[in-house]
Structures are given as C-alpha cells and as structure tokens.
Amino acid sequence: MNLFTDFEARINRILESIEIIREKRSELDFGRINVEPPRDASHGDVATNAAMVLAKPLGMNPRALADLIVDKLGQDPEVAGVSVAGPGFINVRLSVSYWQKLLAAITRAGVDYGRSTFGAGRKINVEYVSANPTGPMHVGHCRGAVVGDALANLLAFAGYDVTKEYYINDAGSQIEVLARSAFLRYRQALGEDIAEIPAGLYPGDYLVPVGEALADEYGTSLRIMPEDKWVPLVKERVIDAMMAMIREDLAALNVNHDVFFSERALHDNGAARIRTAINDLTFKGHVYKGTLPPPKGQLPEDWEDREQTLFRSTEVGDDIDRPLIKSDGSYTYFAADVAYFKDKFDRGFHEMIYVLGADHGGYVKRLEALARAISGGTAKLTVLLCQLVKLYRNGEPVKMSKRSGDFVTLRDVVDEVGRDPVRFMMLYRKSSEPLDFDFAKVTEQSKDNPVFYVQYAHARCRSVFRQAAEAFPDLDLSSVDFAAAAGAIVDPTEMQLVAKLAEYPRVVEAAALSHEPHRIAFYLYDLAAVFHGHWNKGKENPELRFVNDKNRELSIARLGLVHAVASVLKSGLSITGTSAPDEMR
C-alpha cells in the first residue's frame, strides 16, 4: 500500500467531482500535480499542489479552488484535518485509524512492502564493471560494481525485468600485451631468469600462477612453438585465468551478473557482427567515407589524416563524427561498441544502462548517438558515471601494502573491513560525486558510521522478539496476526515511525526512476534514526517500551510495528546488497 498513490487517487476522485474541472478536463495538465510529504512535517502528512496547478487554466483563484478541494477532503473519515498554506498548497493530516490500517498492510506484506509494478515487466539491461581482464579488480572498479549491482536490484524490486551484464574487453591490444606478460611468467616457471619485467608488460605477481599453469600444461613446448601459434593459446588461458580472478573478486563483494559477453564474439567469423552493424548504419544513411579534421588538444588513437569509414554521429547528437573502419581496413574500438549495442537491441532491450567510471565521460555522447542511430530513437540509453573513490585511514590518505602491481585491489579493501561496509558506503554518496572512504570510520560502532547504524537497527528489532519470547513464553510469535493487532498503536511517537515506513514505496519508485540507488541507503539511515530515537524514549519512559509483560495486547501490537521496521530495513539492505544481521556484538 503506497500512501501517496492512495491519496493521489482520492484527490483525483475529488477533482473529477468538481463540475468546472470535468468540463475543462481536456485543457488541464494533471501530470504536474504532485502528492508528496510536506517539506515541513509539522504542516501535516500529505501535501498537494493540485489547486496551484489547475487554478490558472480554470480561471480561478488558487486558494478558492483549494477551499473547494479541502471541503471535500475534510469529509473523508480517514482525514483528521486539512489546511491551505501560502498561495494554495493543501496539507492533509491523517487519522490514527489510517495509520493503523497502513501498519496492518505493512505487517502483512513483510519484506515485499514497497515492491512495485512501476517497471511493468519492461526489459532493461544494466551493464556494469566490465573491467579489462588484465588483472585483479582495483578499488577504482569497486564503486561502479556496487552502484550497478544495487541499481539492478532496485529496478528488479520496482518491477523491471532486469539483466545484469558484464562486457569482457578481451579483443584489444591490451590482451596481446597480457599474453606476452603471461608468456614471460611461463618462461620464469620453467626456470629461466627473466630479470626485470620489461617496460610495457604487466608486472603484477598475479600472473605468476598463470605462468606456472602454462608450464604444467605445455611443458617446454610453448617455448619452441612459433609466435603465431603460442600467442592465441596463451591468450585463451590467461583471459580465462583473469576472468576467474575477477569473478572471485566480484563474489567477495556480493556482485552478480547474469551475462558475461565477450568482445571477441563480435570479431568471430571475420567480425561478422561488426560488419552487420555497420551495414545497418549504412542502410540508414549514417555512414560515409571521409577525413576528419584534427581535434584540438591531444590526438585520439583513432584519428588519422587519411580517408576512413565514418559514423555521421553529429547528426544524432555527437560533437564529432566517429571512425568505424581505419584506412588500413581494420575496425576501430568504437565499431565493436556499435555492434555490441546492436546485439543488446536485437536481444529485445529497449532500455539500457551503462555504469562507467568518470574517466569515460567522453564516451557518453557517442554512445547516446549510436543508440539513436541503431534504434531509430526507440531505445533509451542512460550512462551513469561514477566518480573517484579516495581512501583514508583516520582522515589521512591511506598507504596500504599492495598485493599486486602498484594499486590497491578490491580484495585488499574487502578483506580489511568486510563486504557490508564496502557495499553500503559505496552507495552513501550520489555516484556523480567523489567519495571518501575511511577505513577507520566504516568500522566504528556509532551513528557516524551509516552501515553500523542501519544494521544495528535491524539487530535491535530482532532482539525485541527475543525479549518478547522471554516475557510471553506461551506465545507462538511465528503465528501471531500482527495486522489484526495494529489497532492498539495510538501513541504519536509510534505514528511517526509508521509515517517514516509509509515513505518507503515512494522512495523505491523515485530511486528507480532516477537510477539513484543511493536514495535507498539515505532512507535506511533516516528510518534507523527514527527507530533508535523511539528505542531511546522507551529507556526514559517505560510506557513506550516495545515489550510490556503486564500488557500482552499492546506488546503484540508494538511487536507488529517492530516487525514492520525490521521488514523494511531488511528489504532496503537487500537492495543495497548488504546483510541484515539478527545480532551484533
């Protein structure tokens, strides 16, 4: 039950009952009417701008129209009071019986409260991480991994048919370098002194096991094999090894994908898929042969002062046209991007989200342009850019011992502080803003540590049920109908907690619509704060405690409230990919 959707329907019925609105309905923009929480909670529980939106096209004074609406709203038995503020905002205060009914609905729904049909089963593809398979994941990949995974969870909860996808960049020049780096480690495994790793190769010790595995499988045969024979073999083995390592890193962070799509598949059969995609663009008039003027500043790798096959991307929103086929006949990296998008589109995805690092900002316009060109404007592509993560310890820039190469790995961070703090804190900032991650802060047991504060609220909820089991040993809590007991909840501070729970469905839909999973993390912290505040009031006033062994009926009702809080906390934590512990010590 969505409080705001419910009252939107009630207000719409009232508007339909007003004669002048019925007469001019076709001239009115109902889409601009909002039903939302008031900015100031002291004004009420629900606010609407309906009178402000409709008054001008109706030729009425906003307050006069508001008075008409207020008169009819005041007749609703579940409305305790209605007032008009300012030039015509309408504020509604709900009755105790309405909050009780809502609490009953939340307890019945449990962890499914807030689940929405907003997405209407539409297919959506969320691509995230897509790190080059050239080594273990570093902390720079961590934020995009969490944001993408949590966003996919959120969209599924909001009713979309979600596919989580990883694009394996396994066809570029970096894979050639990786194969040669692994071959060097193979020679080392055979006893050869390789001295220093030559410049340009990958120096990380993570390739040592790959070299040893090659030595075990092939013995000395690779060393005497022609280069054009051993390179493809080593490429295959090292890509498999790197992807196994990356999958382990992702699993450590509780990040999951449904599809791992190999870029090499686009180049199979003479790059048939890339050819098909370019032919499709050509047929639609988006491809021509020409020479691009040199861009300002540093020249990009795909620029040539020769005739190339170009994508006329400036006609579909890009700043410059993009090369597809170089003068030597080879395909550009962007040509594979075109084929990959077409593959997704052909798989039935008309909504796609790419979660990329901030360093990919220059790719946004070209991706949006190819989406318009391939789909004819029918596909919706969204690019989310994740800003950098800076590591600190007690406010000082972190200087960690590095396990591999010269970077801090994702596993370094997860192994030190745990999966839950990493996941939750990666969501505790809007992804477009830089994030400071302090190893000391994320393990503090205080309200200043959001993940602890939220998880502790859930653990406290579960502890209330353990207290109840001791207070009422003859009561089977698993079979109690908490919804039926909700009528005993009457205290104003308890109503504040129900009101905060009532916001959850709206937060879910707004976060899904804006592709902002951080809104869930923010909401969970706010809910935890209201719950902890009520818990502390119970310490000061025994009458407000959740369990009162002298009042069984009231205790059962309050257990229903606690059950509702625990359910929403668990639901939201599940979206963020974070656990909801029953105990915390």
Swiss-Prot record:
Classification via PROSITE patterns: AA_TRNA_LIGASE_I
Alphabetized GO MF terms: arginine-tRNA ligase activity; ATP binding
Name recorded for this polypeptide: Arginine--tRNA ligase
First-tier enzyme category under EC: ligase
EC number(s) recorded for this UniProt protein: 6.1.1.19
Keywords: Aminoacyl-tRNA synthetase, ATP-binding, Cytoplasm, Ligase, Nucleotide-binding, Protein biosynthesis
Subunit relationships: Monomer.
